[in-house]
Each structure stands twice: as structure tokens, then as C-alpha cells.
Amino acid sequence: MASKIGSRRWMLQLIMQLGSVLLTRCPFWGCFSQLMLYAERAEARRKPDIPVPYLYFDMGAAVLCASFMSFGVKRRWFALGAALQLAISTYAAYIGGYVHYGDWLKVRMYSRTVAIIGGFLVLASGAGELYRRKPRSRSLQSTGQVFLGIYLICVAYSLQHSKEDRLAYLNHLPGGELMIQLFFVLYGILALAFLSGYYVTLAAQILAVLLPPVMLLIDGNVAYWHNTRRVEFWNQMKLLGESVGIFGTAVILATDG
């Protein structure tokens, strides 16, 4: 009996570490995909979301925070720094007005950014630590969970009001309109769980199971988003990387919630 409990605990710790790896490496992929995206725009004489001098500082801060988080050095402080850096850069890109996106694409982009910020706040609370030396900050974790709930509300909203997202589900998932409504209800219930703070572990476990097929069939269908919906290739790859980071957050909360 004790050996079964020990092996189960070991497996949960291994899965939790996997979630931490996916989340802490997310900024590296974000910076790489942004560099590739802005290189493509430069060839077409188009501007990046953030002016170039500030862009280098922004990416430098992201890589710095990601590096320290990855090595586990002052992870809580640098996770908080990563959340702050991402919030500032997103706000700067939004008010800059250098690039104009469709409303449906803004919802997809900014909702994922909110979820990643929430993931960093969860990490800053002490969740996902293999050997926790300090007590966990419940306020930071609750705030991060609220951000995840906001993301899920945005996803549910897109399923009802964005024809681009609806077609992505209709074309690549069986069940048609019934499947869309089931996903809408499921996203709504999960959002309520994260926003209220009740059944968070169960909600995170369901989300961790739900996200991989959605990432593979919906976000991973680059041909649909790039060729049909004219989403820039590296922008879609950035969104896909953020979905992986959100999955990492769900795994952390599912195993250490």
C-alpha cells in the first residue's frame, strides 16, 4: 500500500514538473516567434507591434525572467517579473496602434496573454515547486486562477460570436453544432470554477485533458488559420506556444492545486 502511494506521489511530481517546464519555457518560444514574425514584416516594410528600441528591452527582460525561472533561481520573484513584463509589453503593443488586428483575432491573442500572465502568477505563488521552502501565497494563486477563468470566458464567447472560431471547431471536430454547444457549456463551467475558487483541482484536471486535442486539431491547424483566415504564420505559432503554456498551467494546478 505504501509503495503504491509512493509511486503515485512520484508520478504526480513528475507530471507537475512537466507542467512547470512547459510554462517556464513559454517566453523563449514567444520571443523566437516574435523575432521571426517581425523579420517577415520587415521584408514587407511593415512595423512590429512595439517600436524597435523598446522591443529589444522587452525581449531581453522576457529571456532573463524565463532563464531564472527555468533554472529555479528565485523562481517566485522572476515569475512575478515575467507576468509584469508580459502585461507591460501587451499594453504597449495595444496602445501603440502600429498593427491592426480583427476583433476576433484580438480576443484570441489577448485572452491567451491573460492566461499566460495568470500562469506566471500561479507559479509566483509557489505552486509547482518540488521542494517548497516558503508557504504558498494563496492571494497570488487566486489571482492567477481568475485570469485563467477570464481566458475561458473569452474562449466561450468566441465560440458563440466568432465565425472564424466556430468554423475551426465545425470543420475539425465531429459532432457539428452540438459539439460547439458542449464545448461552450464546458468552458463556462470551468471558468466559473476558476473564478470562484471552488473545485479548482478538478477543473484544472479537466482542462489539462481537454487542451491537448484542442491544441492539435484547432490551434495546430496552421493551414486553416494562415491560408483561410490570413493569420500571420508566426503569429499563429506564437498562439500555439501560448496554448502549450496554458496547458502547463493547468497541469500544475491539476497536480499541485
Curated annotation (Swiss-Prot):
It is found in: Membrane. The chain crosses the membrane at residues 21-40, 52-72, 77-97, 110-130, 139-159, 182-202, 206-226, 233-253. GO terms for cellular component: membrane. Keywords: Membrane, Transmembrane, Transmembrane helix. The keyword Membrane applies. It comes from Homo sapiens. It comes from the Eukaryota. May activate NF-kappa-B signaling pathways. Its main location: membrane. Coiled coil: none annotated. It is a multi-pass membrane protein. This is Transmembrane protein 101.
